[in-house]
Amino acid sequence: MATNVKKVKKLRPKNVTVGIAHIHSSHQNTIISFTDKQGNVISWASSGSIGFKGTKKKTAYAATLATAAAAQKAREHGMREVIVELKGTGQGKEAARKQIITSGLNILLTKDVTPVPHNGTRPPRKWFKRQEKR
């Protein structure tokens, strides 16, 4: 019996010279995605996709390796300059930004787009208990 073999298309380089690096650093993980100016994802990586599990995903070292992997893919697509958008309060935010520089990409602008409530809704009860212990 013959089996059907799927043909896998090889991705062509997109030739994007200027893009945006979105770095989302939470308390558990760091997600990095490189997009073009319109927001189409060119490459991405996270601490979990690199192979880290559990509490090791939130470390700055894991964010560094994830950024290096995503930046390498972005450079293969022709990206040379990036605008960095940082979001979140995790450990890997600054480590990821520094890794972008060492991976050979020029940073044009750095923005912190962390959402900050202007006295929005009341936080849940468990938040108050945590604040009292500090």
UniProtKB/Swiss-Prot annotation:
Composition skew (Basic residues), residue ranges: 123-134
Gene Ontology biological process: translation
Keyword list, A-Z: Ribonucleoprotein, Ribosomal protein, RNA-binding, rRNA-binding
A GO term from the CC aspect: ribonucleoprotein complex
Cross-referenced InterPro entries: Ribosomal_uS11, Ribosomal_uS11_bac-type, Ribosomal_uS11_CS, Ribosomal_uS11_sf
Homology family: Belongs to the universal ribosomal protein uS11 family.
Function: Located on the platform of the 30S subunit, it bridges several disparate RNA helices of the 16S rRNA. Forms part of the Shine-Dalgarno cleft in the 70S ribosome.
PANTHER family: 40S RIBOSOMAL PROTEIN S14/30S RIBOSOMAL PROTEIN S11 (PTHR11759)
Protein name: Small ribosomal subunit protein uS11
Organism from which the protein derives: Mesomycoplasma hyopneumoniae (strain 7448)
